[in-house]
Amino acid sequence: MALENPKMHNSEISQRLGAEWKLLSEAEKRPYIDEAKRLRAQHMKEYPEYKYRP
């Protein structure tokens, strides 16, 4: 979406993507949720001492 609309603000992109996400069924969301879990586990394994500090 950002590539298609390079002048669009990040907040607008986030709102639109959030709206699209809500329209997806659980089955359509599942691959993304599974990939997020896999990446989270990989990150925890590679960086066990990491703590998020904003």
Swiss-Prot record:
Lineage start: Eukaryota, Metazoa, Chordata, Craniata, Vertebrata
Residue ranges: DNA binding: 1-54
Pfam families linked to this entry: HMG_box
A GO molecular function held by the record: DNA binding
Alphabetical UniProt keywords: DNA-binding, Nucleus
Residue intervals passing through the bilayer: none
Keyword Acyltransferase belongs to the record: no
InterPro entries: HMG_box_dom, HMG_box_dom_sf, SRY-related_HMG-box_TF-like
Localization, UniProt: Nucleus
Broad class of the protein's primary localization: nucleus
Any GO CC annotation of this UniProt entry: nucleus
Residue stretches in coiled coil: none
Superkingdom of origin organism: Eukaryota
Protein's recorded name: SRY-related protein CH32
